[in-house]
Amino acid sequence: MLNSPGNFTASKLAWIKENEPAIYEQIDKIMLPGDYIAMKLSGEICTTVSGLSEGMFWDFKNNRVADFLMDYYGFDSSLIADIKPTFAEQGRVNAIAAKELGLKEGTPITYRAGDQPNNALSLNVFNPGEIASTAGTSGVVYGVNGEVNYDPQSRVNTFAHVNHTIDQTRLGVLLCINGTGILNSWVKRNIAPEGISYNEMNVLASKAPIGSAGISILPFGNGAERMLNNKEIGCSIRGLDFNAHGKHHIIRAAQEGIV
């Protein structure tokens, strides 16, 4: 098992089973968002290896659903939907979805994956050693690994990448920082001029030099960080000079700290 965080599907499902058993008993199949969207489009329920791995349900070593995890939590195997390849026909747009969305009925649904595997796909990141990075609500560094291994301290997540197969190991190792988007929001509310937009913040930040004239901001201010062994170290601002720095330096330093 290469994922063990409490904020992923398997652990959430275990919480529902223990705390809301009446709801749990109504479950037919478990789905990730991509599975649910495909179901609404086609009326069919299926999933992928990549999706199951993001939910913590995949046994990478044996290339199958993690029976040991299902047994540990007391999940029935019937909860797992039929598994389809990531790139394959996974259903077709039905009449209801076609009418509502203006799509052609019968259009094949041929791909699905989670947010970070999708981001890596869009950046042409497929092979061991290649890395994709993104900053939004959270900041993510997602690197492709060609071997089945793991971090014993659980500081990172491991997913089956979109091109992972039995014959070709391609695992996405994900490092996540919680405090990126909220840092930008905090700076807008508390540091930037009142009423400024995010685009105007970008313009203001561009007036500061690369490196923000020596200010550095570490965006660890949104709770515990798994990459730091679940420590809450808080955000820190370093190198601030009251005689030399202005709002534009701080805004740029926050953005540089995020990326």
Named regions from a protein language model:
Residues 59-61, 86-90:
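Short beta-strand to alpha-helix junction loop
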Residues 1-46, 51, 56-74, 95-259:
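Active-site core segments that coordinate phosphate-bearing ligands/cofactors
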Residues 73-88:
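A conserved helix-loop-beta module that forms one wall/lid of the active-site cleft
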